[in-house]
Regions:
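Short glycine/threonine/proline-enriched tight-turn/helix- or strand-capping micro-motif at secondary-structure
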Residues: 11-19
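Short acidic/polar mixed-charge low-complexity motifs
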Residues: 10-11, 70
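Glycine-rich beta-strand-centered segment in the early N-terminal region that forms part
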Residues: 20-36, 45-95
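Short, non-ligating residues that shape and space the ligands of small metal-coordination modules
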Residues: 100
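Extreme N-terminal starter segment of soluble prokaryotic enzymes
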Residues: 1-2
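Residue-level recognition of beta-strand termini and adjacent short loop/turns
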Residues: 8-10, 24
Length: 101
């Protein structure tokens, strides 16, 4: 799959990387349909913040391709949104339904 890799300020390369696979029973694999550049991606690109040579981009929409055995809230073919923040679903904010607080 194609992946945007931050190399250094001012340089992002598109490289081929292996497709993700289910590693845990709670995992889901999504095919990205659209992705966007976030303001924090621009921090690295402009050199305002440090970032190793790694994949960038963390806001996207896509289609679920595969789910782990413990996943019950989605199924293959569902359209999903990747939020800008990750949630653990165990903290007080998550338990109150505000996962990105």
């Amino acid at each position: 799959m194609k992946t945007a890799i931050f190399k250094k300020p001012g340089l992002i390369a598109v490289e081929d990387h292996p497709k993700p696979t289910i590693q845990q029973p709670t995992d889901a694999v999504m095919r990205v349909v659209r992705a966007c550049v976030c303001g924090s991606d621009l921090w690295y690109y402009r050199g305002d913040s440090e970032h190793g040579q790694d994949a960038i981009g963390h806001e996207a929409i896509g289609v679920v391709e595969e789910i782990g055995d413990d996943v019950t809230t989605m199924k293959p073919g569902d359209l999903v949104i990747v939020p800008f923040a990750f949630s653990d679903n165990t903290c007080p904010h998550c338990e109150n339904g505000v996962q990105t607080a």
